[in-house]
Amino acid sequence: MKLSLSPPPYADAPVVVLISGLGGSGSYWLPQLAVLEQEYQVVCYDQRGTGNNPDTLAEDYSIAQMAAELHQALVAAGIERYAVVGHALGALVGMQLALDYPASVTVLVSVNGWLRINAHTRRCFQVREQLLHSGGAQAWVEAQPLFLYPADWMAARAPRLEAEDALALAHFQGKNNLLRRLNALKRADFSRHADRIRCPVQIICASDDLLVPSACSSELHAALPDSQKMVMRYGGHACNVTDPETFNALLLNGLASLLHHREAAL
């Protein structure tokens, strides 16, 4: 699996791996790259079955497989210890990595994540699946911003959204791959295993997230032994895109604090 690695800013700089959500594209993290690359070696990638890692996914594709193939690719690139920043599905992959490779994951940052899918989130995905089946990729892509961004943010950026729709449609991961990745997301349940995650965790959520209620992050916080939670008052599901200044400050402060905390505990 192809990875994109930034040059380390100094010798032995910590590694931060960015894992996007259901869309799977590493470019999702563009608003974070410049600030992170000043302090860390940053790893981005298109998830298997998407972007520049095309593949046909098995029907039983799982979050555990997503975690295993990423860890193997990192080890092949010479990276054995790393912090993980995951958004939504990416946060699930991050938790799986922390469970399966505890010696490798130094810190986990969960952005609008959850223990198991909330009834409201499931309802949103049911509607989106119906759109996919009835209207195809175009209907899926055109509806997606409604679940990602605040209404006023979208209204002020209509030309940008039209351009993003065209790009997303041109690089659509395919109906079968999308549904198999979505099914993996819906099957994931960390409610019985979260207390085994021993690395420090930063939880970031947006109170106005339409897709994933912020209560899901509160449940995560209660279940994870060594976690801290930060709430953004504005930003929607893609809060790192809509309010990168606020998000980046939270992320940079959290990573610095938790990595120091981890080193001090060793």
Swiss-Prot record:
Disulfide bonds: none annotated. The keyword Hydrolase applies. It catalyses: carbamate + 2 H(+) = NH4(+) + CO2. GO terms for molecular function: hydrolase activity, acting on carbon-nitrogen (but not peptide) bonds, in linear amides. One of its GO terms (biological process) is nitrogen utilization. Its EC number is 3.5.1.-. One of its GO terms (cellular component) is membrane. Belongs to the AB hydrolase superfamily. Hydrolase RutD family. This is Putative carbamate hydrolase RutD. It comes from Escherichia coli O6:K15:H31 (strain 536 / UPEC).
